[in-house]
Amino acid sequence: KLDGMRCICILSTKNPPVLKSRDGRIIEGLTHITDELSLIKADIILDGELYAHGLSFQNNMKLIKKYREGETENIKYNVYDSMSESEFMDRYLKACSIIKDCKHVQSVKTYAFHSEEEMKRYHSDNISLGYEGSIIRYGDIGYENDKRSKYLLKYKSFQDIAAIIIDILPSEADPKKGVPVLKYNNITFEAGTAFSHADRED
């Protein structure tokens, strides 16, 4: 599971490639990606994620939403599906075949597993490589557009603790908001969400 921006790419033999967000907004400023995609002569719609591995979600968004010379070029288009009525593996392999020569467009590795033990092993590998989690797909139906598919499941690992809230530190930027101070096993610490106030408003 990649913690970036969902991106739909419309490729056409007649028109330049178009990158769109999940809600249909045109994504601009990623010419290092669209220049490569323009060399592909195919009529296909790709589905994937704009993402630079190793960066936080917030830093990925900064580089995607506003061009920063020498930094935005680290963003890659990670393709994991294409839109058609074909079964998933056919869609995936077709997408992989047309982007195989690209530098900034790459396929997301996909594995088949046949037991819970195998699934957990692949998931553990994903976590150790610094990914957010895993996406589990089952079934062979065609691409489902404009809906959350019941055949796709997010799989994450969590560690839960029960800590006592002993204080809330007000924010200098917005006094109505703050950071909770927690206590667990005689250890006091602050807990945040890693989101800015602007991100939380969004």
Protein language model regions, located:
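Amphipathic alpha-helical
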Residues: T110-Q159
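Covalent nucleotidyltransferase
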Residues: K1-Q106
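Classical nucleotidyltransferase
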Residues: M5-I10, K14-G48, K147-D202
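Extracellular/periplasmic catalytic domains that process cell-envelope and extracellular macromolecules
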Residues: E71-T72, I127-S128, D174
